[in-house]
Amino acid sequence: MAVQQKIRIKLKSYDHSLVDKWASRIIDVVKETDAIIFGPIPLPTKSHVYTVNRSPHVDKKSREQFSFSSHKRLIEIMNPTSRTIDLLMKLELPSGVDVEIKS
């Protein structure tokens, strides 16, 4: 049995529309090369809440909360060709999207 090569691409952003847009763009590029693709698989959204004092000296009970969510998508590419990797390297992702690639 032959060992299949696999590439995992994880996209992270604070804006869910950016993640979905670029996940679909990556899928379109990979489909041109006849590689098998799974995804985008939505991973759990993490919410971060930060609490700060409104006043620097008094009124300890007066606080303000800031929250933001980080959205993640996972794309798996099975049996990528050299053309697949070249096309993925040529993609210019926006600064609001963080990309992790594991093979």
Swiss-Prot record:
Keywords assigned by UniProt, alphabetized: Ribonucleoprotein, Ribosomal protein
Keyword rRNA-binding: no
Record GO terms (molecular function): structural constituent of ribosome; tRNA binding
Cystine residue pairs: none
GO cellular component, one term: ribosome
Any GO BP: translation
Cited InterPro entries: Ribosomal_uS10, Ribosomal_uS10_CS, Ribosomal_uS10_dom, Ribosomal_uS10_dom_sf
Subunit-structure text: Part of the 30S ribosomal subunit.
Record function comment: Involved in the binding of tRNA to the ribosomes.
HAMAP family for the chain: Ribosomal_uS10
Similarity remark: Belongs to the universal ribosomal protein uS10 family.
NCBIfam families: PRK00596.1, rpsJ_bact
Record protein name field: Small ribosomal subunit protein uS10
Gene: rpsJ
